[in-house]
Structure formats: C-alpha cells, structure tokens
Amino acid sequence: LRTLEAVPGVHPVSHHLPGRITTLYPSAPLTVTPLAAWGAGGRTVVALKLTSTVSRKVVLDPRALQGNFVTATFQHRWLGPAGTPEDTTTLYLVTEGRPDRAFIAEPARRNATAVHKTG
C-alpha cells in the first residue's frame, strides 16, 4: 500500500552500508540492519531495522547512538523481548552527504578459515 506521492527532489540512494551494523548502538542488545535510504539537498535519510536480542524490554535512547548524524528518531521508544511482535522497530537517521561516512567503521573481521603455519 502506497500512502504518499513522490516528493520532488527526494530520490532513493545507495547507502553503501554493511548488511549488519555493530558500531551504531554498541551499548544495546540488538541487531541493526539497513533497510533503505533517500537523499535530497545534500542530506540523506537512512532507515534501519532494530531488533532486540534479549528477553527483556529495551528502552531506546538516541543519545547512545555512535556516529556523526544530523538527527535521529525511532519509530517506537522501546523494543519488546526477542521473539515478540514488539521486538522490532525502525530508526531513521539524517546524515550530511553519503551515509556510509557518518557511521563508525565496522571492526575488521578475521578470516576464520585462514591457515596459520607454525615454525
């Protein structure tokens, strides 16, 4: 169901973000997954899915977000316990320019299949 008409000047953009973001809200027990992004006038709005990973309520606080954002808003102020209908919400972030530059880089992943030679 589409409830809004296209807005002149607003266009979809590629967010160039990893499939899972761990550096955005490291203090909260949740997973963060990028959904979509839209741009206009040098700014970008990024929609991210937040899902609880614990069996208790998680209260969301935009002050705990890590990165360089113009503003942020959550669709809901809290997440329910994992596995409940309330365990997921959407976070909307506004960034200047490309969104991938506003996020803290993900830590380098070690190759689990690497073979280490010993001496």
Q: Which role does the model predict for each range below?
A:
Residues 1-19:
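Surface-exposed beta-loop interaction hotspot
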Residues 20-25:
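Long, low-hydrophobicity ectodomains and other hydrophilic envelope-associated domains
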Residues 35-40:
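Short, solvent-exposed beta-strand/turn "edge" segments of beta-rich domains on protein surfaces
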Residues 42-46:
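Short, solvent-exposed loop/turn segments enriched in Ser/Thr/Gly
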Residues 48-55:
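Asparagine-centered strand-capping/turn motif at beta-strand->loop junctions
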Residues 55-58, 99-101:
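Short beta-strands and strand-coil junctions in structured, solvent-facing domains, enriched
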Residues 65-105:
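Intrinsically disordered, low-complexity Pro/Gly/Ser/Thr-rich segments with frequent PxxP/GP/PP motifs
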Residues 102, 106-119:
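Extended, charge-rich intrinsically disordered regulatory tails
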